Amino acid sequence: ILACLHDSGIALLFDGGETLDGQPFYTMEYVDGGAVTDYCHASLESVDLRVRLLLQIAAALSSAHRNLIVHRDIKPSNILVNAEGQVKLVDFGLAKLLGRPMLPTMTHAGLGPMTPAYAAPEQFRNDPVTVATDIYQFAVLGFVILSGRLPYRCDPTDSLEWARAVTEEEPMTLARAFDLGEEARKPKNPARYRRHLTRDLDAVLRKAMAKDPRARYGSMDAMRADLEAFLEARPVTARRAGPEIGRAACR
């Protein structure tokens, strides 16, 4: 699958095959970087800078989707960032080609392959995985990058409770999640940072994390457009016009 992808935001595949004892292997580009959440904590002190990094990730995922590939396992350890701030999407081990049946695979507690903390509702229901699944997972990643924690209050290691939250509960607001996050992981000026966790950003992430895949953005490019609108202080399509204070007033 990875051999189909040629994008600056996706780690290159050099070779692959099987060992003499039948074990699959592949060799890929070495990425001198760490998990995206660690990079944000160490280097990105503002909401805007973190949204710009999310746009890099979204562009890489858009490239995969244009090649009819869904990643299915978007999480911090699969998004590496080097010292120059260049994103590299790695580990397509759970990826699938759209329109092709999946080979039998190991599952999590009888479900399809996934990382529960970042899995979409349809993955817990064993429903088909589509581009909308990546959009949901990307939104959870964005929520973690921006707020410092996952979008639901329960413990993700409690599989049944987490599955219930993902399929039934609404996510917290970014500001509320930020308030509940670890103090040691917050930016140096938390009050200023929190002011920029606006309703527009909440609206974008909530749309992308809709329980029904059909209610999410129709494509990663559509979500990217709303994130770009946020950065440019323009209205986002995810939010209906209303009297609430928007981003422009928070600047």
Predicted region positions:
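AlphaC helix of the protein kinase catalytic domain
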Residues: A35-E45
